[in-house]
């Protein structure tokens, strides 16, 4: 089993994060074969081992095809390209899918979050705040959601700044759909789309707190 496939299978285990994922990935890469017994030797539960082994071959093949496209990346947590800020968080993602410019992940960033049903006051000051910072080289990072997230991304792009969108679903889906043009503009201006979830994961409500 090649390293990339190991990472893809481990990313499908929703309760596996950070140091544990990296440790298990490196250990599995050295094994001549991988089965449920071998997986449980790493500390995975039987259920987690079954999830690893049952990850669909079709999903693996489609993910590998996705990674062949320009500016499509799979970034393990031990990669030099992994965002250093994330390593300081509890239960950081063991790997990330990234579409766009990797150097944006190492830029000075401000994370902006807010209400989906914002007030005119929130929109006005959110836009002004993000525009001002973006003109000074700060990368605006948000979640591509309706409301203040969209305001933040658009404000950065309006002044030719850079913005990063961290999604609560796989990168095969832009959610909400109305923000597909916004995501495209973000990529055109040197930003990135980032997700810790497998490419086909839909926008499920319980993933958004994890994304935040």
Predicted regions and their residues:
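Glycine-biased, small-residue-rich flexible motifs in mid-sequence functional cores and linkers
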Residues: 1-4, 74-212
């Amino acid at each position: 089993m090649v390293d990339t496939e190991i990472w893809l299978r481990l990313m499908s285990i929703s309760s596996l994060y950070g140091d544990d994922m990296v440790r298990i990935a490196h250990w599995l890469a050295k094994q001549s074969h991988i089965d449920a017994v071998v997986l449980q030797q790493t500390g995975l539960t039987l259920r987690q081992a079954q999830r690893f082994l049952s990850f669909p071959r079709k999903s693996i093949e489609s993910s590998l095809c996705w990674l062949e496209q320009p500016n499509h990346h799979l970034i393990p947590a031990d990669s030099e390209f992994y965002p250093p800020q994330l390593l300081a968080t509890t239960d950081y993602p063991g790997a990330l899918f990234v579409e766009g410019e990797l150097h944006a992940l190492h830029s000075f960033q401000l994370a902006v979050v807010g209400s989906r049903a914002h007030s005119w006051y929130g929109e006005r000051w959110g836009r002004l705040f993000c525009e001002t910072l973006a003109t000074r080289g700060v990368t605006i990072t948000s979640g591509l959601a309706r409301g203040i997230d969209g305001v933040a991304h658009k404000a950065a792009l309006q002044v030719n700044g850079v913005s990063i969108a961290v999604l609560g679903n796989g990168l095969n889906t832009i959610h909400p759909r109305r923000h597909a043009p916004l995501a495209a503009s973000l990529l055109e201006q040197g930003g990135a789309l980032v997700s810790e979830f497998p490419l086909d994961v839909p926008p499920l409500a319980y993933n958004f707190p994890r994304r935040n």
